[in-house]
Amino acid sequence: MTYRLASPADARKVATVLTDAFANYNMYRTVLNSFFTTDSKYIDYLNKLHYVQVMSNIRKGYCLIAEENGEIIAVAVMQSLRHTRITLWDYLRSGAFALWRYVKPTQCFLPFLDKSSEYAKKQTSENRWYLESFVVSPAWQGKHIGGKFLDEAVLPLVAREGGSQLSLVTNTAMNVFFYQKHGFEQIHQTKIGGVDVWTMLVEVKSEK
């Protein structure tokens, strides 16, 4: 398994991995199901949304991928809360116009994500990073890919770039257990719109 930062040429494949991993994630279904009459429209929306997220972070943040024989099998999307500033213009130039048909779900989903991540993105004196998305392709789940990717690539990248903390939000107790096994502590828990939200944090030894 090899690791590298994604390029713009990878964006559609990366977006597909995110959609495949999140399509049946309970949080997504709880927040978004009522807006879609068919699964095909729901998947189309997720692909477009994830493409904008990925392309914006390739340009301004960090999109790290794990590959096996040239296949993208895991993705980590993250930002330095001190240095990364992704603006509305960045989203627009990354394809946000393609979401115009999906105004209502977007108006619901993005505020939900903002509210969910408030505690994780709380500014401190530390150089905190935020892990916005972390997924393993469904075909590769259950093979310890996520743990290796986190320990061998994600945390070392944060350290090399001068980060001293990495925070994230998750919505399942199973994921909380996974992150705790890799050194994260639960620092906050709440419920938003019927969805459980756990905030996790790990200290990172900065190399800068």
Role assignments for model-derived ranges:
Residues K122-W129, L157-N171:
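Conserved GNAT acetyl-CoA-binding A-motif
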Residues V136, G142-P156:
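Conserved acetyl-CoA-binding loop-helix of GNAT-fold acetyltransferases
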Residues K205-K208:
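Short, basic, low-complexity termini and linkers enriched in Ser/Thr/Gly/Pro
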